Regions:
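Bacterial N-terminal signal peptides
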Residues: 14-25
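Mid-length scaffold segments of soluble, non-membrane domains
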Residues: 103-164
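Intrinsically disordered, low-complexity segments
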Residues: 8, 19-20, 261, 266
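Glycine-rich catalytic cores of cysteine/serine-nucleophile enzymes that process amide/ester linkages
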Residues: 30-38, 43-118, 141, 221-236
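N-terminal secretory signal peptides that target proteins for export/translocation
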Residues: 1-10
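Activation targets extended, charge/polar-rich intrinsically disordered C-terminal tails
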Residues: 28-35, 137-270
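A mature extracytoplasmic/lumenal domain signature
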Residues: 54-56, 76, 84-89, 113, ...
Length: 270
């Protein structure tokens, strides 16, 4: 009895720590005004662009999870097209998949966006058709569950698996990214650089060059990224080097670019 009491107290204290830390982390990130500053304006950069974003979701879910979406811009195009899953759309339509031309680095219900992936130039141009095909092939357009999935993060992870050249590494706060049907418990990780075993996103393990070693328990992710010297914790997210150094790639922090250049995660703007 004493053992179970101590275990229960430990779990309670850990959950309190997670909630408090996630509140602080969310406030700290939202204090950085990133909306409108992460995507190159079509008038200033004519090359192809692929970007993946995350932002804290709305309501109580924001304590633990982010919402993710993917945006693309074809070479010489004047507009970005964003793709995402929005669950409440199913109340009025037969699909939760949303496709629209808009500002890709918008805020999400007041929460500032975080750039997870940035690919520009010839590589982006070659991958955009594959991304669009993956969007069209997403099997859960009419099926949505906030937890454990399929949800918006399941959608983004699906694109990562279908287009492994993206090298997409979703954060530990992207609850639903590990959702897999019983018929496909084992398969490629979301980054396309490793393998994953997961049962409906409730329990699983992943190992890959981008993810590092990742353990999932009830949708909460613990990740050790040895290559980038970072760790990721449930609700809190990444501690360590960011996946994308926005000071190096975004026109809001760096010189505007007007010509089609090769990219590094994949983007390097000079």
């Amino acid at each position: 009895m004493i053992y179970f009491k101590n275990f229960g107290n430990s779990v309670k204290n850990y959950l309190i720590l997670i909630v408090c830390s996630s509140l602080l982390a969310g406030c700290a990130f939202d204090s950085k005004l990133t909306a409108g500053k992460l995507a190159p304006k079509p008038s200033e950069y004519n090359g192809a662009v692929i970007q993946v974003y995350a932002a804290r979701t709305r309501g109580a879910k924001k304590l633990f999870s982010v919402h993710t979406w993917i945006s693309v811009k074809a070479k010489n195009s004047d507009d970005y097209t964003s793709y995402e899953i929005i669950g409440w759309r199913l109340r009025r339509r037969d699909t939760a998949l949303v496709e629209r031309s808009n500002q890709p680095d918008k805020d999400w219900w007041g929460h500032q966006p975080e750039l997870l992936l940035d690919i520009r130039g010839p590589k982006a141009e070659s991958l955009i058709p594959k991304v669009i095909q993956a969007v069209n092939n997403y099997p859960h357009k009419s099926n949505y569950h906030a937890w454990p999935g399929p949800n918006s993060n399941t959608f983004t992870a699906f694109i990562g698996r279908q287009v492994p050249e993206l090298g997409l590494d979703l954060p530990s706060t992207a609850i639903g990214k590990d959702y897999r049907e019983i018929s496909e418990i084992v398969g490629m990780s979301a980054s396309g650089t490793g393998v994953q075993a997961s049962l409906w996103g409730l329990i699983g393990i992943s190992a890959g060059l981008e993810e590092g070693l990742e353990i999932n328990l009830l949708g909460l992710n613990f990740e050790l990224d040895l290559f980038d010297l970072a760790i990721e914790l449930p609700a809190i997210g990444r501690i360590g080097a960011a996946d994308v150094d926005v000071s190096e790639i975004t026109p809001a922090f760096k010189t505007n670019v007007k010509n089609d250049t090769a990219s590094k995660t994949e983007t390097s703007l000079k």
